[in-house]
């Protein structure tokens, strides 16, 4: 019995010592330091794909800081050219005008909100139980409701509803794109991006030149005249008219055509990418340990730079900038 106990203690010690040793990315050569371009008024506290909140309540959009303050304990959901979309601690949807005026709009829903967006008089909401709804901004009346499968577990990177003229694209928590006509209030089509059991919500969507690209954590879809799907373990994705670039959990940068045809791949052992952007003729991959990897679009050449960044910094991708902590760097 004593021997068994000793063996168990030894095995446990070995297990924990093995788990505590984490491999990290170490570049073979660093070209130099990528200097900070400027500072924010406070550190980043919340991030979404479209905007971020600072510790002092100020809003950070892709264009930079705005003279808008969001109340403490509110959760940032989304931001567009007209509205800053938030959730209050009581579960209400609260819209703040993007121009900084005081004419806020409150929807007393008393429900947990996963994602939301606003266009003209249409407010599109995805609730955390995967229910989709359309409301009138002016009257606050419910115009449309559609239920879906309640997810077991989701990725924190939840994509907001997307407006395409009169169409509303709900990006569900179970890996589907549900297309609703906002005028007729009818579901026109449902497209499956991925069918994994866990963490299957859509994390990204963009439409360029009538080609739709959407992804979950495990799959990417391209939809134009035809549908194409490919499986990747996706950390970050960037999409332009020239192609798609993916940073994977395996430390790879992968280049695809807009229709998902494979073009190139470059692997960086143990790299944990936290941001990806395509600017001009370069692909910029931000690595968690404080490195900027600048690659040519064909991934045949690259340079690595040091960045003054901590591994636990919250990251926000702006227009030609990476924001982290209370500062930013330019990549244009």
Model feature map: region roles:
Residues 55-60, 89-94, 129-133, 174-177, ...:
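Loop/turn residues immediately N-terminal
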Residues 1-21:
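Sec-dependent bacterial lipoprotein signal peptides
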Residues 35-48, 69-83, 108-121, 152-162, ...:
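Repeated scaffold domains used in trafficking and secretory/extracellular systems
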Residues 15-36:
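Bacterial Sec signal peptide processing site at the extreme N-terminus
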Residues 140, 145-146, 152-258:
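Acidic, serine/threonine- and glycine-rich low-complexity intrinsically disordered segments
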Residues 32-34, 63-73, 101-108, 141-153, ...:
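A short beta-strand motif characteristic of beta-propeller blades
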Residues 60-63, 95-98, 135-137, 180, ...:
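Hydrophobic/aromatic beta-strand positions that recur at structurally equivalent sites within the blades
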Residues 241-332:
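Hydrophilic extracytoplasmic domains
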């Amino acid at each position: 019995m004593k021997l068994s106990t000793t063996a168990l203690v030894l095995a446990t010690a070995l297990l924990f010592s093995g788990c505590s040793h984490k491999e990290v990315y170490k570049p073979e050569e660093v070209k130099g330091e990528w200097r900070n371009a400027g500072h924010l008024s406070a550190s980043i506290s919340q991030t979404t794909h479209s905007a971020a909140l600072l510790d002092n309540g100020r809003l950070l959009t892709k264009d930079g800081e705005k003279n808008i303050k969001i109340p403490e304990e509110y959760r940032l959901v989304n931001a567009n050219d007209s509205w800053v979309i938030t959730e209050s601690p009581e579960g209400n949807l609260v819209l703040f005008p993007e121009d900084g005026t005081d004419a806020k709009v409150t929807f007393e829903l008393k429900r947990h909100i996963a994602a939301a967006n606003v266009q003209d008089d249409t407010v599109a909401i995805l609730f955390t139980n995967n229910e989709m709804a359309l409301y009138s901004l002016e009257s606050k009346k419910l115009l449309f409701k559609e239920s879906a499968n309640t997810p077991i577990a989701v990725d924190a990177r939840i994509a907001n509803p997307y407006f395409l003229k009169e169409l509303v694209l709900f990006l569900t928590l179970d890996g589907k794109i549900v297309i609703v006509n906002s005028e007729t209030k009818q579901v026109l089509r449902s497209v499956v991006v991925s069918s994994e059991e866990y963490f299957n919500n859509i994390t990204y969507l963009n439409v360029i030149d009538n080609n739709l690209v959407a992804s979950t954590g495990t799959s990417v879809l391209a939809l134009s005249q035809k549908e194409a799907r490919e499986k990747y373990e996706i950390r970050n994705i960037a999409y332009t008219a020239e192609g798609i670039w993916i940073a994977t959990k395996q430390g790879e940068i992968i280049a695809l055509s807009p229709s998902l045809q494979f073009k190139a791949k470059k692997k960086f052992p143990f790299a944990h990418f936290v941001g990806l952007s395509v600017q001009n003729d370069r692909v910029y991959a931000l690595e968690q340990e404080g490195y900027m990897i600048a690659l040519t679009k064909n991934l045949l050449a690259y340079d690595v730079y040091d960045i003054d960044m901590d591994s636990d910094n919250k990251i926000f991708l702006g227009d030609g900038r990476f924001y982290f902590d209370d500062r930013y760097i330019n990549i244009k």
